[in-house]
Amino acid sequence: MRLVMASANAHKAQEIAEILSGHDIKPRPHDLGDIVENENTLEGNARLKAVAVCNETGFPAVADDTGLEVDALGGLPGVRSARFAGESATDDENLSKLLDEMRKVPEGERTARFRTVALVVFPDGREILAHGLVEGSITLSPSGGGGFGYDSIFAPDEGKGLTFAEMEPEAKNSISHRGRAFRSLAKMLGD
C-alpha cells in the first residue's frame, strides 16, 4: 500500500520507513508548509498532520506524535516535547531545558516514559490508530551519539542500562515507543 509520510523530521521518517518497510512509503511533499501542532493531545497532533498530508496528496497519510512524560515534572514535557524550550527550539535546547529542570531530582526519582500515537488517515476519512509506550528513566547527563531528540538522556527499562542514543537502531526500534506503535499499525494494515 502506498503511504505518504506526514513527518518532516528526517530521523523520524527514516525510523518509520524502516518499520513499515512492507509498504510503498513516499516522503512528505516538499512544497507542503509547516503544519502547526496546536492540539492538546498526541492523537490530535498526529491527526492534524495526517489529514493535511492526505488532503494535499490524495493518498493515505501516516503520521505520529510522541511525548516524553517525566513523572518528577508532572508529566511534562508531554505533548509539548518538541517545543519544550520554545516554539522554534532545537533538540539540544529542549534536552538542556529538561536536564536543567531535573537538576535537583535524585537518580531514583527520574522515572519517565515515551508515548507515541501513530495514525493513518485515508482519503475516504477512515483512520487506523495505534499506540506505543516504553518506560524508563532520565539519565543525569547525555550519553551516546545515535538517535535524536531526547534519546541521549532516556534509558529504557528494557535497554540494559543503555540510552536510546547508545543502542543500535535495530535494538532501539525493537523496544521503542515508536517501534511498538508502528508495528501495531503495520499489523492493522495487513502486514
PLM feature segments, named:
Residues 1-4, 11-191:
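Anionic-ligand binding patches
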